[in-house]
């Protein structure tokens, strides 16, 4: 997957301030993507209902998310934090709930949906705990619920203001999670630290069947590739995700300070895109796209230079298998724009062939 140059603004100028933290979800159960955005200085969560289609979302006005008693969900934050929304069925009752990471103290709050997916009504927030103690990552928590160890129970991954990512294992049930003490996620054999203000999402970025981490921080957007298994992920060191810019090659994605990432297939074309919030309250959309190889040039040393229609100035080199000198117009899919290695699939041959490729600098 390659990310389009530049990015398009989805909802510039969030109400009341900046530090936008986006979450894409079908909030009202109408089959279309909606957008939740945590924002400062108000410390609230804006709900943008989709007035377009699922493949072509359109947003105009917003409302602030409220609990069932009519009060706005509110999480004040000192400095440059904002409430970080995450939507999932947290208690296993088949309905979407809301989790919110608090900027000021690094806690995570659970707002239970007491009504339906078509018309969510949220109970007052309850802080998550580790044993009898309040769960916290210190400051600027950004929760992500996922079954990290594939034991059938949803765990919690959480970014933090210090740039580390913590794994809280669910040791109880899907209906009543109980979390073990935090364990730092490792990448490249050391504790993963993305700089400051880390956000982490789980997605199979390179299409090899293994879940990876797609992350962001103040310094960029990153991919941590899983080289082991889904039940026991072993992550490579973070690699910067870039976008092709004509005349400049691959350039790291930057939307401004305080980048917060959310991967989603925004336009329903089967390729993952990136939605990014920043410090100025703007939410950007970077489109991932399939592309078709336009030219294959065999080179010495079991390598081949590939050129494609959307970015002919980029070269990739085959690192394994024989040089595919007889391929004409192969289709490449799910090729990440960042990182040293990935896979691409030749769909023209009778049998699919897979090659490990590397950006030729």
Go through each PLM region and give its residues.
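Blade-edge motifs of beta-propeller repeat domains
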Residues: 1-17, 51-80, 114-138, 171-195, ...
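Blade-level signature of beta-propeller repeat domains, shared across WD40, Kelch, NHL, RCC1
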Residues: 254-291
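Short, composition-biased motifs enriched in small/polar/acidic residues
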Residues: 290-361
